[in-house]
Amino acid sequence: MKHKVGILGGTFDPPHLAHLRMAEEAKKQLGLEKILFLPNKIPPHKHISGMASNDERVEMLQLMIEGIDSFEIDTRELMRAGKSYTYDTMRDMISEQPDTDFYFIIGGDMVEYLPKWYHIDDLVKMVTFVGVNRPSYQTEVPYDIVKINMPETTISSTEIRNNIENASTFLPEKVWSYIKEHQLYGKK
C-alpha cells in the first residue's frame, strides 16, 4: 500500500494560521499520513526590503509546526541553484519515494494559474492536485483536481506584512514572538 503525503508549497513570508488550517484540513479530509511544507525561493525581482530571509522563513515554519509530528519541512527548493520548478521538485521526490502518492495542495486563488505552470501536463500525471475551495475564486481548469473545503479566510502573507502591527491574531503565537524579536516586516 502506498503512503499518502501532502505537499504545501509557498513563500511562507510569514507562515500564518490559514497555512496551518489548509494543511490540517487536507490531512484530515484526504487521510494523509503527513504534510511537507515546501518553502519556495523568493524570486530576486521580488526580494525587497522588509521581506524575511530564507533562514527566517524556515525558522518561522519550524515554530508554526512545532509539536505536530505529521508536519515536516522540506527545504530542497531553497537549496537548488537557479530556477526551481514544482515539476523538478516532484520528479525528485517521486524518484526518492516511489512508494508514495503525493498530493500537492494549492489555495483556490492558485487553481486558475495551473495551466501556466512549467510542464503542467506532465505534473498532473505525477501528483494529485488538491484545491482548497474558496467561494471567491474560480476553480474550473481542464485538469482533475481534488477539492477540499475550508472556511473562507481573508488572511494573506502580503496583508500581514503590510499591516504587521495588527497581525498577531492571524499568526501562531510563536511566529508572532519571532517576528517581534527579530523586528521583521518593520515590527519594532
UniProtKB/Swiss-Prot annotation:
UniProt cross-references to CDD domains, sorted A to Z: NMNAT
Swiss-Prot/TrEMBL catalytic activity: nicotinate beta-D-ribonucleotide + ATP + H(+) = deamido-NAD(+) + diphosphate
InterPro entries from the UniProt entry: Cyt_trans-like, NadD/NMNAT, Rossmann-like_a/b/a_fold
GO molecular function: ATP binding; nicotinate-nucleotide adenylyltransferase activity
Entry keyword DNA repair: no
EC number(s) per entry: 2.7.7.18
Keyword Iron-sulfur: no
Role noted for this protein: Catalyzes the reversible adenylation of nicotinate mononucleotide (NaMN) to nicotinic acid adenine dinucleotide (NaAD).
PANTHER family registered for this protein in UniProt: NICOTINATE-NUCLEOTIDE ADENYLYLTRANSFERASE-RELATED, PHOSPHOPANTETHEINE ADENYLYLTRANSFERASE
Protein name: Probable nicotinate-nucleotide adenylyltransferase
Gene that specifies this protein: nadD
